């Protein structure tokens, strides 16, 4: 893969991920890794939680830069820290990976392509482009049904047509990170969906691309019922104008 001189940064929020993060880093394709400018690991656990990185890992992957939160601030907050630093570094593209390996690093070349060529501003890696693939990948049936129902409701409410709003495999151009006022979005698991919503409403070009689904024995910190009700809250807030951001 040729990144055409683009400065690409990978952002990885990490919380109690010492056992899984090394495997995620090892799965980044070699040709992509060689062309990465920086890998930003955001330690979101604070001092009381074991760190996901150690001296051995940092020596093996010298492109890693570790960013620390003094206490657990949340999934969205960790991304904000990463993207803020990516912009400071002059990144042209920021790609998000999960430290637990749920989203395949092997897909990075294909997902990066629309951003490298300039045909998209934001890339959504969607598990729901193929319902059969989602189920084969181990997505629990209750999550599968909830994803479909919530996504259809969101598309209806927002006047958009995306295959899902609940994937954590997101990639952004520098333009996307400057057009969307991401600092004003949620610090929680809703950050990704809000980025997608606000980006689309601001006219960003979104590539909705299929990715494989993987559910293994990784620990999830998302509470499904609470999350579902909070999605309804996001829809309510949208209709109240929370995501209009006039003049930005």
Residue positions per predicted region:
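Short, conserved active-site loop motifs that form the nucleotide-linked donor/cofactor pocket
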Residues: 8, 37, 63-65
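A conserved acidic beta->alpha catalytic loop
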Residues: 43-53, 101
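Hydrophobic helical membrane-anchoring modules
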Residues: 1-8, 159, 183-248
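Acceptor/aglycone-binding surface of glycosyltransferases and processive sugar-polymer synthases
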Residues: 71-88, 93, 105-189, 216-226, ...
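Donor nucleotide-sugar binding loop of glycosyltransferases
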Residues: 17-20, 46, 75, 104
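Short, well-formed alpha-helical segments that are part of the catalytic scaffolds
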Residues: 17-30
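Short beta-strand/loop segment that forms part of the nucleotide-sugar
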Residues: 36-46, 67-69
């Amino acid at each position: 893969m040729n990144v055409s001189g683009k400065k690409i940064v990978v952002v990885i929020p990490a919380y109690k991920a010492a056992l899984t993060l090394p495997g995620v880093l090892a799965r980044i394709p070699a040709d992509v890794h060689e062309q990465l400018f920086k890998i930003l690991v955001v330690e979101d656990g604070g001092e009381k939680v074991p760190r996901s990185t150690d001296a051995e890992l940092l020596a093996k992957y010298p492109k890693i830069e570790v960013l620390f939160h003094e206490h657990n601030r949340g999934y969205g907050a960790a991304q904000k820290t990463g993207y803020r630093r990516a912009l400071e570094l002059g990144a042209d593209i920021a790609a998000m990976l999960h430290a637990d390996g749920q989203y395949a690093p092997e897909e990075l070349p294909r997902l990066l392509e629309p951003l490298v060529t300039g045909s998209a501003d934001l890339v959504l890696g969607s598990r729901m482009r193929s319902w059969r693939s989602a189920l084969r990948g181990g997505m629990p049936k209750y999550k599968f049904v909830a994803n479909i129902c919530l996504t259809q409701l969101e598309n209806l409410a927002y006047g958009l047509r995306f295959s899902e709003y609940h994937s954590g495999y997101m990639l952004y151009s520098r333009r996307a990170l400057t057009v969307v006022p991401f600092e004003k979005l949620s610090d929680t698991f809703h950050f990704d969906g809000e980025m997608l919503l606000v980006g689309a409403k601001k006219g960003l070009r979104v590539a909705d691309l299929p990715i494989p689904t993987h559910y293994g024995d990784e620990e999830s910190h998302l509470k499904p019922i609470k999350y579902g009700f909070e999605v309804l809250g996001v829809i309510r807030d949208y209709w109240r104008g929370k995501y209009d951001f006039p003049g930005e």
